[in-house]
Structures are given as C-alpha cells and as structure tokens.
Design a protein with these regions (language model features):
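N-terminal flexible/basic segments that precede or flank functional cores
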Residues: 1-39, 102-111
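Flexible coil/turn residues that form the inter-helical turn or adjacent wing/linker of helix-turn-helix
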Residues: 37, 48, 77
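Helix-turn-helix DNA-binding elements, focusing on the entry/boundary residues of the two helices
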Residues: 41, 52, 63, 78-81
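The alpha-helix within a helix-turn-helix
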Residues: 45, 56, 85
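Short alpha-helical DNA-recognition segment
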Residues: 49-68
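DNA major-groove recognition helix of helix-turn-helix/homeodomain DNA-binding modules
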Residues: 60, 79-95
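Membrane-proximal amphipathic alpha-helices
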Residues: 68, 75-77, 83
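Short, conserved catalytic or interaction motifs in soluble domains
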Residues: 71, 96
Length: 111
C-alpha cells in the first residue's frame, strides 16, 4: 500500500459513521479560526514588505508578540485587533459561518 491510500484514523471512523464529540469539533473550529487570523496577519505584513519587528514597532508590540500571533499562539483581544489593523493600514473583516471562517485585512484606500 502506498501513502496515497493511507487514511487517518479519524477519516476511517468518519466513514464508518463515527462523529467527533462536540468539544473536539469546537476545539478544531477554534484552531481553524486562529490559523486563519495568523495567515491574514502574515499575508498582509508580507504584502506591505514589513518584517515582524517593523510591524511590532508600528503596532506598539514586541516582535515576539507578532511571532505568537502569526504562529496562532495568541488569543487576539479587540484592542489587539484594532492595533494590528491600524499598523497594517487595513480594515479587518471576520466572517464566521457554521461551516467556515474567513479572516481578511482589506487595504485602506489612499484618501
């Protein structure tokens, strides 16, 4: 059997009608949202050509905090979201649905 035919234990159980406990599904959703936010920060920072240290200076944070945010290791608060949006010169859009989450930074147009 080659690797393309392997299935994760979770996939096999799902195929047999097993479903994860609600707590596991909720935790998985939280991880997906944290990863979506981390990716949005990273992508916008790269679009602006900023280093983590430069973004940290703009946001009044430490480089280590930016690293934790981009590594999905920080729980963002509303003040942190505001600081990052301002530092990234963008509006932050978060769409929460039952089957997906989307986090994007939209560049502010020059006025």
């Amino acid at each position: 059997m080659n690797h393309t035919r392997w299935k994760l234990d979770r996939e096999r159980r799902a195929a047999q009608g097993y479903s994860e406990p609600a707590e596991a599904e909720a935790e998985r959703a939280e991880v997906r949202l944290a990863m979506a936010f981390a990716k949005a920060v990273y992508d916008r920072r790269k679009d602006l050509g900023l280093s983590q240290a430069e973004l940290a200076a703009r946001a009044g944070l430490t480089q280590a905090k930016i690293s934790r945010v981009e590594g999905a290791d920080a729980v963002p608060t509303l003040p942190l979201l505001r600081r990052l949006a301002h530092a990234l010169d963008a509006s932050l859009n978060i769409a929460l649905g039952t089957d997906h989450e989307e986090v994007t930074f939209v560049a502010r147009s020059a006025a």
